Amino acid sequence: MGILFTRIWRLFNHQEHKVIIVGLDNAGKTTILYQFSMNEVVHTSPTIGSNVEEIVVNNTRFLMWDIGGQESLRSSWNTYYTNTEFVIVVVDSTDRERISVTREELYKMLAHEDLRKAGLLIFANKQDVKECMTVAEISQFLKLTSIKDHQWHIQACCALTGEGLCQGLEWMMSRLKIR
């Protein structure tokens, strides 16, 4: 009886899962958001504040907040943390000069109380560009293996083509099934 109830509950459970998409300016956050929501590339300009879209994957609803990444906006990221289940960090794989800034922002975020249970998905974006950092390099620069308090996954992607994005969503879906 309990198993039947659980299966029926899953059919009708329309719980929304809050996701924030962060990263430095020009990393590709907004492009990824609109690839998820419209499955196409849209012309974007720097995000001032945030964009929000609901994405439905296999009857699972994600409310995705794309938050501006300019230096002047990063201090306000924490206002979006409440009830966040997943953090997507978008890394510009061509931006070797600012990978250390990305690392600083990442660890600042992970230390925040409101994100202590959040899963972490890192999109290594712009993998289509020659001479970009590999997933292994980014993982090493960000010291991802030192993250013990959060489930995390790093995924190579290209926001312009959508390559790798579905695999990231699949990882998030797999984390929800475990809960």
Curated annotation (Swiss-Prot):
Organism encoding this protein: Rattus norvegicus
Origin: domain of life: Eukaryota
N-myristoyl glycine lipid attachment residues: G2
Family per record: Belongs to the small GTPase superfamily. Arf family.
Sites where the protein binds GTP: 23-30, 66-70, 125-128, 159
Any GO CC annotation of this UniProt entry: cytoplasm
CDD domains recorded: Arl5_Arl8
Tissues expressing this chain: Low amounts were found in most tissues examined with highest levels in brain, intestine and thymus.
Matching PROSITE patterns: ARF (PS51417)
A molecular function GO annotation: GTPase activity
Record protein name field: ADP-ribosylation factor-like protein 5A
Known role: Lacks ADP-ribosylation enhancing activity.
